């Protein structure tokens, strides 16, 4: 027969001690975790409340401080503010473009730009207003108005202003010089120029002398039918007046600070006078007709350059 062993009381007490110690350890761990969570939540709440409270305090104290310092700052500004200087008025220039009378003025003195070579500028396109009428001025002149700082030597422009005077035979000859034009496009100076050498003059020399006039009296016989010298002089043809070449005035090669007035009508009149002189001289000598006209013309006209003189 099997014998069943009865539990002893010592074993029950040992089992109760082990279970109680385990429960106490678990409770202590849970309590520690809860305490950590509560501390974290409290820190977050305090931080949020402090940020809000600090913003409210900043607004309150800032408004009160600004209200107190506003009158003081205004007084200091009034005391330290210097008197306003009178600003220089803007200079308005008004120029008129006319095909008959054109005023050419140099660019402002404060702009320094390199000038192109004469050979290069000779082929540059230039905006030029055509002359529609020789006698009547343009009815609708183009008027331009722009702001431009007056250079310091602007007063010197009026003193050095010059005008082309009508040509006369007794006028002294001027040395060969250069003229330069600088038009503007869209209120900006267009950097193009014309360099024209005007040192060429044309002289006409007759190669073949004119044939003797048949109306001239014969002085071979000095007898009774002789005509007095006074009457012979009346029958001689009046020679054409010898006119000198048209001297075209020129300008200095150096840049001038003055304004030069160019009279297109006067220039056209001089060209017409020169044409009449050439026609008068060419009419005194008969030229052969036919295909040899061009050859005779080239023989009877001799052109010489006086630029080297």
UniProtKB/Swiss-Prot annotation:
Coiled coil: 259-285
Annotated region (Disordered), positions in chain: 209-231
Entries under Pfam families matching the protein: Spem1
Predominant subcellular localization, coarse grouping: membrane
Transmembrane annotation, as ranges: 29-49
Record keywords: Coiled coil, Cytoplasm, Developmental protein, Differentiation, Membrane, Spermatogenesis, Transmembrane, Transmembrane helix
Topology term for the membrane: Single-pass membrane protein
GO cellular component, as recorded: cytoplasm; membrane
GO biological process, one term: sperm individualization
Localization annotation: Membrane; Cytoplasm
Function: Required for proper cytoplasm removal during spermatogenesis.
Record protein name field: Spermatid maturation protein 1
């Amino acid at each position: 027969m099997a014998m069943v062993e009865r539990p002893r009381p010592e074993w029950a007490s040992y089992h109760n001690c082990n279970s109680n110690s385990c429960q106490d350890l678990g409770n202590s761990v849970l309590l520690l975790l809860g305490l950590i969570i509560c501390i974290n939540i409290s820190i977050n709440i305090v931080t949020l409340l402090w940020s809000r409270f600090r913003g409210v305090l900043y607004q309150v104290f800032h408004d009160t401080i600004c209200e107190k310092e506003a009158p003081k700052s205004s007084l200091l500004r009034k005391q330290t503010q210097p008197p306003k200087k009178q600003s220089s008025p803007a200079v308005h220039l008004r120029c008129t473009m006319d095909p008959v009378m054109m005023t050419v003025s140099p660019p402002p003195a404060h702009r320094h730009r390199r000038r192109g070579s004469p050979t290069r500028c000779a082929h540059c396109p230039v905006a030029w207003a055509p002359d529609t009428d020789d006698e009547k001025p343009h009815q609708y002149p183009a008027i331009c108005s722009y702001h431009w700082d007056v250079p310091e030597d602007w007063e010197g422009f009026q003193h050095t202003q010059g005008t082309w005077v009508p040509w006369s035979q007794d006028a002294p000859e001027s040395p060969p010089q250069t003229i330069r034009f600088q038009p503007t496009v869209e209120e900006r100076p267009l950097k193009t120029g014309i360099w024209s050498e005007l040192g060429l003059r044309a002289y006409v020399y007759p190669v073949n002398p004119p044939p003797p006039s048949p109306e001239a009296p014969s002085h071979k016989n000095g007898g009774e039918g002789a005509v007095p010298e006074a009457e012979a002089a009346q029958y001689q043809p009046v020679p054409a007046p010898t006119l000198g070449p048209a001297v075209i005035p020129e300008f200095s090669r150096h840049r001038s600070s003055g304004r030069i007035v160019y009279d297109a009508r006067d220039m056209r009149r001089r060209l017409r006078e020169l044409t009449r002189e050439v026609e008068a001289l060419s009419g005194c000598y008969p030229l052969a007709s036919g295909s040899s006209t061009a050859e005779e013309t080239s023989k009877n006209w001799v052109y010489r350059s006086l630029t080297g003189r």
